Curated annotation (Swiss-Prot):
HAMAP family given in the database record: Ribosomal_uL6_B (MF_01365_B)
Protein's job: This protein binds to the 23S rRNA, and is important in its secondary structure. It is located near the subunit interface in the base of the L7/L12 stalk, and near the tRNA binding site of the peptidyltransferase center.
Keyword Mitochondrion appears in the UniProt entry: no
The name this protein goes by in its record: Large ribosomal subunit protein uL6
Organism: Desulfatibacillum aliphaticivorans
Similarity-based family: Belongs to the universal ribosomal protein uL6 family.
Transmembrane segments: none
An annotated GO cellular component: cytosolic large ribosomal subunit
Length: 178
């Protein structure tokens, strides 16, 4: 049995979970999320808890059970409290600005980079060039943050680039003079 998959998922107040036709729908204060359900796993909603139950006990299915439990738990957390990711832009002349749903980045290239934000993701840029991304879909939020970071990943010598706020860059020593 999957240890993660066996844990029940608490349903907060003002959050509604429904399962129909192999699709799980979670609706809460911040919005609504839908996801297809794996055919080898069932969701049982009892009171204010959701449990993920495998249809057949097999090793691969218990792995899927843990995955589905994590995905549904992220959906419940997303529609009730939401997710947040902070990126830092480091470097001389590097800056970030927000124009509507487009993030304008100056990253040391010969041209500015315009990054359109996907629907469901909101961004804020403060004076210290910190980009705060928020959304209810954890998967979409993480992919958006990774795509922005990939535009100019941090380099190990001076630390210039875009990095996650909690990320620690291991610095290398540069060349020593003659």
């Amino acid at each position: 049995m999957s240890r993660v998959g066996k844990k029940p998922i608490p349903i907060p107040a003002k959050t509604k979970v429904t399962v129909s036709n192999g699709t799980v729908t979670v609706q809460g204060e911040k919005g609504k999320l839908e996801r297809p359900l794996h055919p080898d796993v069932e969701l049982k909603i009892e009171g204010d808890e959701i449990t993920v139950v495998p249809v057949v006990e097999r090793r691969k299915i218990t792995a899927v059970q843990g995955l589905v439990r994590s995905l549904v738990a992220n959906m419940v957390t997303g529609v009730s409290t939401g997710f947040k990711r902070v990126l830092e832009v480091n470097g001389i002349g590097y800056k970030a600005e927000l124009n509507g749903q487009t993030l304008n980045l100056t990253l040391g290239f010969s041209h500015p980079v315009d990054f359109p934000l996907p629907q469901g993701i909101t961004a804020e840029v403060d004076k210290k060039n910190n980009i705060t991304l928020e959304g209810i879909d954890n998967e979409l939020l993480g992919q958006t943050a990774a795509s922005i970071r990939a535009l100019r990943p941090p380099e190990p010598y001076k630390g210039k680039g875009i990095k996650y706020a909690e990320e620690r860059i291991i610095r290398k020593a540069g060349k020593t003079g003659a």
